[in-house]
């Protein structure tokens, strides 16, 4: 049996990407953003097609993502942040709630969101991961933007066939 398959597409030319970056743990978040923007450029996304907004912390990321999603101007969004474990339960709360909020926005607005909000035990782990995770976020955003656009086209083929059948019936 032969099955259809979609090959990953990392061509960023023409894609519009919105990035929301937390300022808490700023050196790590700046490292994430630098790596992400550099990778977007390498993938062909034009600088004028990228909007970067910053928010105070990880819990504010979902609301900013929601506003960007509501605008309808972006093919994909990226969440950048760093939640580093401290001595209280706050780490779990921030990690869980920001992650759930990001997922909800993606599903509610049918827009891909690359989640690169790091959750680490200490600063060293965050610094060690920031560059590669920033790059990963760019690749995920571009690939998922292209995938969702390709999947959106699946329904268009059926509509085109129905229109062709309707046109033939009208001519008969």
Swiss-Prot record:
Enzyme Commission (EC) number: 2.5.1.78
Any GO CC annotation of this UniProt entry: riboflavin synthase complex
One GO MF term: 6,7-dimethyl-8-ribityllumazine synthase activity
Compositionally biased tracts (Acidic residues): 154-172
Pfam families, per the entry: DMRL_synthase
CDD domains xrefs: Lumazine_synthase-I (cd09209)
GO terms classed as biological process: riboflavin biosynthetic process
Catalysed reaction equations from the record: (2S)-2-hydroxy-3-oxobutyl phosphate + 5-amino-6-(D-ribitylamino)uracil = 6,7-dimethyl-8-(1-D-ribityl)lumazine + phosphate + 2 H2O + H(+)
Binding-site list for 5-amino-6-(D-ribitylamino)uracil: 24, 58-60, 82-84, 115
Positions of the UniProt region annotated as Disordered: 150-172
Biological pathway: Cofactor biosynthesis; riboflavin biosynthesis; riboflavin from 2-hydroxy-3-oxobutyl phosphate and 5-amino-6-(D-ribitylamino)uracil: step 1/2
Keywords annotated in UniProt: Riboflavin biosynthesis, Transferase
EC top class named in words: transferase
Binding site for (2S)-2-hydroxy-3-oxobutyl phosphate: 87-88, 129
Record bears the keyword Transferase: yes
Residue positions of the active site: 90
NCBIfam families xrefs: lumazine-synth (TIGR00114)
Function: Catalyzes the formation of 6,7-dimethyl-8-ribityllumazine by condensation of 5-amino-6-(D-ribitylamino)uracil with 3,4-dihydroxy-2-butanone 4-phosphate. This is the penultimate step in the biosynthesis of riboflavin.
Family statement: Belongs to the DMRL synthase family.
PANTHER family: 6,7-DIMETHYL-8-RIBITYLLUMAZINE SYNTHASE (PTHR21058:SF0), 6,7-DIMETHYL-8-RIBITYLLUMAZINE SYNTHASE DMRL SYNTHASE LUMAZINE SYNTHASE (PTHR21058)
The name this protein goes by in its record: 6,7-dimethyl-8-ribityllumazine synthase
Species in which this protein is naturally found: Burkholderia multivorans (strain ATCC 17616 / 249)
Gene name of the encoded protein: ribH
